[in-house]
Structure formats: structure tokens, C-alpha cells
Regions:
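Amide-forming acyltransferase catalytic core, primarily the GNAT-like/NAT-type
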Residues: 1-62, 126-208
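Structural motif
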Residues: 6, 56-57, 65-68, 114-117, ...
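Short, structured motif recognition centered on aromatic/hydrophobic residues
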Residues: 52, 75-80, 96-100, 113, ...
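Conserved acetyl-CoA binding element of GNAT-fold acetyltransferases
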Residues: 73-87, 204-219, 223-225
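A structural feature that tracks compact, well-ordered secondary-structure segments
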Residues: 79-81, 98, 114-116, 124, ...
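Conserved acetyl-CoA-binding loop-helix of GNAT-fold acetyltransferases
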Residues: 87-103, 127, 218-232
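Conserved GNAT acetyl-CoA-binding A-motif
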Residues: 103-116, 235-246
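Active-site/acyl-donor-binding loops of N-acyltransferases
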Residues: 116-118, 128-148, 241-307
Length: 307
């Protein structure tokens, strides 16, 4: 059966699958909780938001999945697929393709997904056109022992934005920059001294996720991290997690020494909905074997939306 949008008659299915969702967006899971929990699923019926869920019913099994795009982003994210007992179902790749096509209608150039490297969902994502562009590990740093370390961090101001963008270009590999765009807003925290440390902070009722950009030449990194955790604004006893991408893997020994707890390694995957070409047009992406990312510089982009 062809995948379709969720409707009100599907509410019993959502309730049945409420504990069987497989998250594909770690930050959203850790800050907001279960994507099919009572607090969040009604938002999928709001047509004003770029938040969409779909159903695929095949061979007596119903599959669910969700995708979201934050206002202003050039990419979308898969939120979840369900149920966890049907990750090898032959209809799952078609559902993922359908969700990606919806993101294309919003103007997204890419769709991202985060999945444990041993997950049974990995093959379905590959069949739906996703490829690995980075790896990451989520570290639980909630119980790192406090110390007398001073904060050393301040709220990012507009005057700090050029330094943050420069740090981004120094750390994020050029081939990944089309997928992970340059920070455009003065949010997060920066080191009070120098311009070698920045962290984006995502708050939610369930927890806080830190995404760092720390230059390898930064000094006293462990002390700076402890100071950050000791003085994190509006923490309110919520658990705190730190997301380490593969290009920042040198941070992991320091986190381990501090007492952080690592999650299983995750593949960060991307599906290209459009690629940029010199004719200043965006066309449907073709992905040659062995090539994950094809960045180009253009001054204007026109998007061919999915049919």
C-alpha cells in the first residue's frame, strides 16, 4: 500500500506503538522524550508546522514515521520510525522515501537521521537513499563530579558570531559543511578567553544537550568542561548530555577521565534531495558510488520540489 499522511483514525495505532518508537533524532529524544508520548504526538496534526508523520500499511502491518524541519534550516530530520519490532519490514524503505519527499516539498536540500550503527533500521535507511557522513557518540555528563572551577563561559553575543563561524570552518570538514550549515545566530556559550571554544545548548523538559566546537589547540579543556557544567544556565537538575561528532573525537578521552558515560556509537546519515550546480539551479540529487557529499558554491538557488 502507498504511504499516506496520518489522520485521526490512526490514533489507536499511535497509542499502541507509544513504547515502540525508534528515535532518529537523539537531541530531540533527550530533550523532549518519547516522540509518541502523550505530550507530543498531537503536534503532528498541526498543518502550520513543518512536522509530518506518515503511515504505511502492508501485509497486515502498520508502519509509522515522522520528519521535521526547523524554520530557517536548509535540511530536515527524520524524528522516528515505529514499531521497533518491524525494522526489517519490506515496506519501511518506502515509508522513509515518502517522508523524505515531504521534506522536499518544504524546500529542504537534505534529510538527516541518527541511528545506532548496529540497529536493524540501518539497512532500511540505506535502501531509502541515506548514506553515512559522520559518526557521533552521546555522552551523559550529568554526574561529573563538581569542582571549584570557575565558569569561563559567557552567553554568545552578536559580536562573537564571526569568531564562532571561523571556529566552525576550522573544525567541521569542508565536505560536511553543506550538510551542517554555518551558525547564523548568536546563541549558545563561548569561552570568556580567546575564541577556541563554543557550545550550542538545546534545552527541553527532559534534558539538556550540548554540542561543542572546541579547537584542538584549546588549553585546559577538561577544566573548561567542568566549569561549563558547574555553571550551566537554567540547568534545574535536568540531565545533561554532550554530543561528540567524529571530527571532535579527541574530546572523548577527556570526557571519560571526567566520569562521563558514553552511549553506543551512532551513524549520522544524510539523504540528498537536491544538489547545487553552477547553473544556479537545484536539481534532484544523484549520488555516485562512494561519494557522500557534493558541495558547490552558488549565489542563488532554485529548488525543484518533489512531485
Amino acid at each position: 500500500m502507498t504511504p499516506r499522511a496520518l489522520d485521526l483514525l490512526d490514533l489507536p495505532i499511535i497509542y499502541h506503538y507509544r513504547d515502540e518508537a525508534v528515535s532518529l533524532d537523539s537531541t530531540r529524544l533527550l530533550t523532549r522524550g518519547n516522540p509518541l508520548g502523550a505530550a507530543g504526538f498531537m503536534s503532528y496534526f498541526n498543518p502550520a508546522r513543518h512536522l509530518y508523520t506518515a503511515v504505511n500499511q502492508e501485509n497486515g502491518i502498520t508502519l509509522l514515521g515522522g520528519v521535521i524541519q526547523t524554520n530557517g534550516d536548509s535540511f530536515a530530520k527524520l524524528v522516528y520510525i515505529a514499531p521497533s519490532t518491524q525494522l526489517t519490514h519490506p515496506g519501511l524503505p518506502a515509508l522513509i522515501e515518502h517522508l523524505s519527499a515531504e521534506a522536499g516539498k518544504w524546500g529542504a536540500f537534505h534529510v538527516l537521521a541518527e541511528v545506532d550503527e548496529t540497529s536493524e533500521a540501518f539497512p532500511a535507511l540505506r535502501m531509502a537513499g541515506f548514506s553515512v557522513y559522520a559518526w557521533q557518540r552521546i555522552w551523559d555528563v550529568s554526574h561529573i563530579t563538581p569542582s571549584n572551577a570557575t565558569s569561563g563561559w559567557t552567553q554568545t553575543q552578536s559580536v562573537n558570531l564571526p569568531a564562532v563561524q571561523s571556529l566552525y570552518h576550522q573544525i567541521v570538514p569542508p565536505l560536511l559543511q553543506p550538510v551542517e550549515p554555518t551558525p547564523k545566530r548568536a546563541i549558545g556559550l563561548v569561552c570568556a578567553e580567546g575564541s577556541k571554544c563554543y557550545v550550542n545548548v538545546t534545552y527541553g523538559m527532559r534534558g539538556i544537550v550540548l554540542t561543542p566546537l572546541i579547537h584542538p589547540e584549546a588549553t585546559e579543556v577538561a577544566t573548561r568542561l567542568i566549569g561549563l557544567l558547574n555553571h550551566l544556565p537554567e540547568r534545574r537538575n535536568r540531565p545533561v548530555y554532550l554530543c561528540v561528532r567524529s571530527y571532535q573525537a579527541w574530546l572523548e578521552p577527556a570526557l571519560e577521565d571526567l566520569g562521563g558515560k558514553a552511549s553506543p556509537r551512532q551513524a549520522v546519515m544524510v539523504k540528498h534531495l537536491a544538489r547545487m550546480v553552477k547553473e544556479e539551479q537545484a536539481v534532484r540529487a544523484t549520488q555516485p558510488a562512494g561519494v557522500s557529499i557534493q558541495p558547490s558554491r552558488v549565489s542563488h538557488i532554485k529548488v525543484n520540489k518533489h512531485e
